[in-house]
């Protein structure tokens, strides 16, 4: 029974991490894609690395 409890707790923690993903992203955080950033930011290159930045627009 205790193994199931551990698995349950792990799945809850993992789900919480995924659910909290967009809220903990901040401006200038390193990213691999736009999904790593909040909706108002985009994953843009500043020369060396990609970071979450405001979309400069068209």
UniProtKB/Swiss-Prot annotation:
Role: May inhibit voltage-gated potassium channels Kv1.1/KCNA1, hKv1.2/KCNA2, and Kv1.3/KCNA3. May also increase intracellular calcium release through the activation of nuclear inositol 1,4,5-trisphosphate receptors (ITPR) of cardiomyocytes, thereby causing an increase in the contraction frequency of these cells.
Q: Does the keyword Secreted apply?
A: yes
Q: Which family does it belong to?
A: Belongs to the scorpion calcin-like family. KTX subfamily.
What are the protein's GO molecular function terms?
calcium channel regulator activity; toxin activity
Q: Which organism is it from?
A: Lychas mucronatus
Q: What is known of its domains?
A: The presence of a 'disulfide through disulfide knot' structurally defines this protein as a knottin.
According to the lineage, what is the superkingdom?
Eukaryota
Endpoints of the signal sequence = 1-16
Propeptide feature: residues:
17-26
Name of the protein this chain belongs to: Putative calcium channel toxin 196
């Amino acid at each position: 029974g205790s193994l199931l409890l551990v698995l349950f707790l792990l799945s809850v923690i993992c789900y919480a991490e995924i659910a909290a993903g967009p809220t903990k992203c901040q401006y200038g955080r390193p990213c691999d894609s736009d999904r790593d950033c909040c909706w108002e930011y985009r994953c843009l290159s500043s020369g060396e690395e990609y970071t979450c930045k405001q979309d400069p627009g068209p």
